[in-house]
A protein has these predicted regions:
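Short, amphipathic alpha-helical interaction segments positioned at domain boundaries
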Residues: 2-20
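Phosphate-handling catalytic interfaces
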Residues: 25-232
Length: 232
């Protein structure tokens, strides 16, 4: 019996498995999510891609197909697949993904998954889970993370990822140092975009460290994730 991932990727030919579901596929989490996270293009882009796909697949038979009023490729929204709840995100930029033959799915590449973790942590198990994933796998996938975030990360995402790699994973790298140029005061920049602002901040990354587990580790209140934490 095909999995929910396989069915979803068959029903929507432009959707790919992302966020916590992609973390699960790549072995970046020990959680078994009860939600299937998928990303597909917005409506206008989806229709354009559908036209291109049909033109490519049918070739010279496209006109005959239309004349016969045969079904066109169209978007079918769905909230559940094989009994699994679906969280479907419409995004212009799905990022890099790969097509797997068995199971027959499309899934976000590892580097993209690490970018999505700092972009939308709530769809990746929450910020604490993101911290844990970076701590455990950041070194292993460092080159993929650096390439993806260098190329596609927004300034705030470079700052969040840079903090996690340097202060949490204890990784030193020239490209991470380069991201420090994106650190800036003001605007209440926070490590967890969905959390509340915390007065404890990283001097280096100009970032409110609003994840409780990173604030103390029993060493006289020193930050668990580096020695540059201060208070306002």
């Amino acid at each position: 019996k095909p999995s929910a991932m396989e069915v979803a990727c068959a029903v929507d030919p432009f959707a790919c498995v992302t966020h916590l579901s992609a973390m699960e596929f790549h072995g970046l989490t020990d959680r078994f999510s009860k939600i299937l996270y998928l990303t597909t293009p917005p409506d206008k882009e989806w229709r354009e891609q559908a036209q291109e796909r049909m033109a490519r697949d049918l070739g010279q038979h496209m006109a005959v197909h239309r004349a016969a009023r045969l079904p066109m490729l169209r978007y079918l929204g769905f909230e559940r697949v094989e009994g699994v709840r679906v969280e479907l995100m419409r995004r212009s930029s799905r990022g890099a993904f790969k097509a797997i033959k068995s199971p027959s799915i499309r899934v976000a590449m590892v580097g993209r998954v690490f970018l999505d973790m700092v972009r939308e942590p709530d769809n990746c198990g929450g910020m604490q889970h993101v911290v844990d994933a970076y701590r455990e796998y950041g070194s292993q996938y460092l080159s993929l993370i650096l390439d993806e975030i260098d190329r596609h990360g927004k300034p705030i995402e470079k700052v969040r990822a840079g903090y996690l790699l340097e202060a949490v994973c204890r990784i030193q790298h020239p490209r991470i140092d380069g991201w420090k140029a994106f650190a800036q005061r003001g605007g209440s920049r926070m490590l967890d975009p969905q959390g509340e602002y915390a007065p404890t901040f990283s001097e280096t990354w100009k970032l409110s460290i609003n994840v409780p587990s990173l604030l103390t580790d029993g060493r006289g209140g020193e930050g668990q994730a580096g020695e540059d934490l201060g208070g306002e």
